[in-house]
Amino acid sequence: PMHGTFDARVGKYTNIEVSKKELDYEIIDDNLVVNFNHDEPTLPGQKKLEITITYLSHACLLIETNEVSFITDPWIVGFAFASGWWPKSPPPKDWSKIVNSVDFIYISHNHPDHLNLFTLKYIREDMEYIVPDFESQSVSRMLIKNGFNNIFKAQFQNYYRYKNTELLLTIFKSGDFRDDSGLYFTYGNFSFLSTVDSNNLNFQKFPTDITLFASSFAGGASGYPLCFETVNSTEKTKVLDRNRKAIKATVRQNIQRSGAKFFLPYAGFFTESAQRDLEILQNNRKNTVENFTDLVASTSLLNINEFDKYFFNGSNLFDYQNIQRDSLDVESPEVIMENVFQNCLFSES
């Protein structure tokens, strides 16, 4: 896979200190038999209710109903990964007012393109957060450190009703060693599943007949191979091409597995805006939304480049439009970085 070489004899990758857990198995009549539990996690919901899904930025979605509203993974302004990533989408007009008006915020994991301190500083301190109950508490600890204490830690695969509303939700763990998660919720007979950018979500045990499936799609998130001088340009191109194809194949499999009526590509709208990263920007080719126009026959693509707000009545999409947006940061990335990092300088003497 994209990690590199896996040595099945010892159950470890050769290039990173990661092991895979051995499956329980039996040998019956010289056949290797592995038993899988394929129970489908399903939340109830029968009523035909209206719900609106709005793309705000990168992995940040706004979900609105007559009873409750929330956003996911707020990164709207500022940079991520030590200024390596910048938002590709201009911020929505009055975005801080929009964000502060919701009932709660779901944060999938603590990477800075999902839990972003530049964005969080604009959010009211009494905001409610629903976060995964990771053993390390990696999300909740960071929120508490930055002044947020209204935190509900959802245990994986437990189902929750939000107060007295029709919103039912559960959080799935990624199927690997990382602190990562995805979100599944229903509102009436509208259902939503997002893998965000996690690997092997819930060990691929998906609910089926999903109304809207959302996931990352772009790739280009790793410093490997472009930032490695030990890899020649030809090999870099091969690795990047392989990774993009692998991501496309995974997305298609997940769409098929979920039986989704609609697919929303998101969590991939970032760019390398700093002048020092021009070479990365020019060579770090990513998948585009348009690369997913040829989907499973029963699934329709929601193209954020065309419309970013979608209106559903139950499982039926009945309208779409564009929201107003401000311009991107007036200040250049270099000015922003200078202001941020000027107090972080150190002397080599």
Mark where each language-model region is.
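Cap/insert and terminal regions of metallo-dependent hydrolase folds
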Residues: 1-12, 134, 203-297
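Active-site HxH/HxHxD metal-binding segment of metal-dependent hydrolases
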Residues: 2, 91-160
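C-terminal regulatory/interaction regions
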Residues: 2-20, 25, 34, 281-349
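Metallo-beta-lactamase
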Residues: 19-48, 132-190
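Catalytic core of the metallo-beta-lactamase
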Residues: 56-66, 160-216
